Amino acid sequence: MNAVLTSLPPYVVLAAAAFLVLALPRRAGHAAAALATLFTFVQAVLLGDGGTGAHVATQLFGFDVVLFNVDQFSLLMGVVVGFLATAAVLYAYGTEAPTWVTAFALVYVSSTLGTIYAGDWLTLIFFWELMAVT
């Protein structure tokens, strides 16, 4: 079970959900976004049982990068951010916020999770700057 959870970083799921919010009708897009944020919450909860370590490591421009590193603190932050993001998506749907606002919020949460699960400085700086842009 852990291999499935660690093969896909949660920020990839949220970035895809941001595009789905824009592409799908309002109700379906927000449902996809709620499921994506709920996935990040559940993933962090389930990885708390022995899922720590560097999971998605590769080389980028000659540098070793770890795109998905899990430790106990990042799991705690992943649970908190996943829960709050799910509540925010449901609130955005309930208040009839424009879909582009929800999409930008998902990109911001996605980059936040990227900083939380960053395993090296290059990954951290990339996602931190992405947070600043969104």
Language-model regions: role of each:
Residues M1-A103:
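Transmembrane helix-loop-helix hairpins at membrane boundaries of multipass inner-membrane proteins
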Residues A103-T134:
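Alpha-helical multi-pass transmembrane bundles of energy-transducing inner-membrane proteins
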